[in-house]
Amino acid sequence: MSDWNPSLYLHFAAERSRPAVELLARVSLENIEYIADLGCGTGNSTALLHQRWPAARITGIDSSPAMIAEARSALPDSLFVEADIRNWQPEQALDLIFANASLQWLPDHYELFPHLVSLLSPLGVLAVQMPDNWLEPTHVLMREVAWEQNYPDRGREPLAGVHAYYDILSEAGCEVDIWRTTYYHQMPSHQAIIDWVTATGLRPWLQDLTESEQQHFLTRYHQMLEEQYPLQENGQILLAFPRLFIVARRTE
């Protein structure tokens, strides 16, 4: 599990794309020229950006070779670059940096966010959406199973928090619009929840385990999910999924 699995990731494409659509709707920019899609994945968000600004020069950035290959296949006329978000440098100032469900994987947001703002043109916008589910049962149980089975902690860090991001970006010279939304996804089974998180949040926990260790982990994880997520009257499961949204406009 050294690289992302585009097919597994796309299994819930509609649910994953909805936050990108809603983030994009809050970006009030017109006639812009340079856009970067950070953590572009399979190119779903890049396609949305092209629809909104067809004349703009858009660059999709992702560190996953598999994701970049999928994006290039889906959008052959677009520019995609395999690179680390932290190290990538654009050739010109950017009018929009769009980062949908990517920056949560990177550490040191107190340094990362001001760095990204520095890449913007005057009045440019940094638009960010990050899953804020570190305290949700899906992610708490990952840590509990790992502790039970004596596996090292592989999970990502929790987000800095609403007030911290507001201060970070305000001090970086931005006007900040920040909000948090909880989606309730209808899941047909507990296995469907596992399928969802295996493509994203569960990846770091499984990547260094043998096949038998992975199966042992997932069996116990499934048992614990059944305890935490009861069935609705119609047999569905409601999976709460909080997400943090930020639209920061550079004022300098």
UniProtKB/Swiss-Prot annotation:
Keywords: Cytoplasm, Methyltransferase, S-adenosyl-L-methionine, Transferase. GO terms for biological process: methylation. Its main location: cytoplasm. Its EC number is 2.1.1.144. It is found in: Cytoplasm. GO terms for cellular component: cytoplasm. It catalyses: trans-aconitate + S-adenosyl-L-methionine = (E)-3-(methoxycarbonyl)pent-2-enedioate + S-adenosyl-L-homocysteine. It comes from the Bacteria. Coiled coil: none annotated. Transmembrane segments: none annotated. One of its GO terms (molecular function) is trans-aconitate 2-methyltransferase activity. Belongs to the methyltransferase superfamily. Tam family. Catalyzes the S-adenosylmethionine monomethyl esterification of trans-aconitate. This is Trans-aconitate 2-methyltransferase. It comes from Escherichia coli O1:K1 / APEC.
